Amino acid sequence: VDFNGFLLNQAKAEVILQQLDENINVGIYESPFYLHRDVDGARILRERVRKPIVEHFQEQYLRNDCSDGFVIGGGVSSTINQSTLAANQNKPFWLQLVGSGLTTAFAAHLGSVLSHAQLPYITCWELWKSTLLKKRPVVTDGYMDVPEGPGLGVEVDEKAIESYRVDEQEPTPKQRYRQKKRILRITWPGAGRQKRVWEFTDEEHYQREFYAGNIPGFMRGIDLEVIEERKSAAFKKRHAELAARGL
């Protein structure tokens, strides 16, 4: 489970992670809070939860021994450097190299020569409509063979690459999404049957409030409703009110 730091501190993280310790479908905790902000608290948290805690690699985590393992990714040189340091402290890690089947083949080759790349890799290749390969990677019981052909050992699907060619001047799907207006309504249980409600116009705004501790996260019953742009006067008025308040 990746919390992206939203548990904020050791005390909050301890309460949530001890509950998740009982869930058999949870194996590892990533970034419950950003450990460099409280390395002593991170060490205490490690002692009080059963399952391993990992964080994106930083040398200070090695010096302070405040995580059980790491997330490592990036270019070849930095990945090898970080993995060597992690191995010297006997810290396992996963490779996080997100991309298509090509990236997955690369990750398999790289990870095969890194002694402590022992945790399940994250490449997200199954999220894409096409792997850009003529043959999909085969994963069996969580393992895949390192491709043995020339180069990365896989054959590129040239037709797929051509079909996904884009005009660099055209806006990306993310840009088109961000151009539209929406209201993000977050609700969670209040007193009795009442609900507490916060509304925002952008993900960045509600993330800022969560990180500041102004609104509580990870409560049972919390819900996010996305209200897409409407032509109604009520939507335009409410969106303008929220935007004027920086929400």
What are these regions (language model features)?
Residues 15, 99-247:
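Flexible C-terminal active-site loop/helix
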Residues 1-106:
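Catalytic core of soluble alpha/beta enzymes
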